[in-house]
Amino acid sequence: MNISQQRFTQALKGVLEYSKNVLHIEVIDTSDLDPYFKGDLDGKRIWIASALEDEEELFNVIHLLGHSIQWNLSKELRALGSVLHENPDDQLLRKLQEYEWEANCYGLKILHEIGIRDLDRWLFEKYRLDMFYLTHYYKTGEKLKAITDVSLAYQFTWPLVEKNIPEFIPYANPETRRGIVIDFTNLTAKGLS
């Protein structure tokens, strides 16, 4: 898949405008995140690591917008996504995987809403790899940028489908953090295909 950086920059600009003008969610570039993380959210705002390349920022912004939508529609999903779960049982892991999938389905809808349909495959590939990394992390606590036997044992790569975005009024969590989106970008990739 050969996509120019200019395309990611253009798409990111459109997503940021949609976030501000349609969803009324503020996206803030910041260097004030724990180094272990590259993004955070509170339901009304998204903080994104300012050092990210546009491609990585685009994925993380649309992913976090998806979670922001979830948080504003469901207190249960807000509670689920507000903590990093360590070694969840299989039932909770499945809920977490479905939560991640749904966020990316909202992200796909956002891309389509701004007229971008040529990044569907790219988004699916980013989501698929993210699911492998997250699944390994959830089950082991190990931050590893790899497709492992553990992540394959709990494989979850449903195809992304547009999910309509209901109207909502964004509201923020009362507590603050310094990161929730795990940064796998600076790790050596192993076993990726």
Regions found by a protein language model. Give the residues of each.
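Subset of outer-membrane beta-barrel
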Residues: 27-31
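Short, exposed beta-strand/loop patches in secreted or surface proteins that constitute
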Residues: 34-41
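Post-HEXXH active-site segment of zinc metalloproteases
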Residues: 71-101, 105
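Basic/hydrophobic alpha-helical interface regions
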Residues: 5-25
